[in-house]
Amino acid sequence: MATIAVAGTGYVGLVSGACLADFGNTVICVDNNQKKIDNLNKGMIPIYEPGLDDVVKRNVASGRLSFTVDMASAVRSSEVVFIAVGTPPADDGSADLRYVETVAREIARAMNGYKVVVDKSTVPIGTGKRVRAWIQDEL
């Protein structure tokens, strides 16, 4: 099984990370919100999804799921990195990709070898090329 980092612990990131861990992968969920990470480490789940509490608790107890604010360490420890951050609407209604860009650049600065980067955020067509360019800019 793989070691996977998931950037973002909202609905998409937390549910994806917990499910990937439940399949047997080692998953490190990362968020820049220290309080959210502290609460997750205490077993306090910030969202409601049927069955999520049990999946998180089971996988934390097994050592397959962990939570941190240390993006660099999570990226260095992983083969696959999921970007699952918010993409709120911009003033013109398009997706605001600033959080995706920030995370992509953070991933690049932490890379210690080949990584598969998966954009799980809700983004427009062509964002994958932009993520690749942002990563290459930092390498």
What are these regions (language model features)?
Residues 7-9, 19, 32, 64, ...:
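N-terminal glycine-rich phosphate-binding loop for ADP-containing cofactors
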Residues 24, 77-78, 114:
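Short, well-ordered alpha-helix to beta-strand connector turns
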Residues 45-48, 84, 135-137:
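Short, hinge-like loop/turn segments at secondary-structure boundaries
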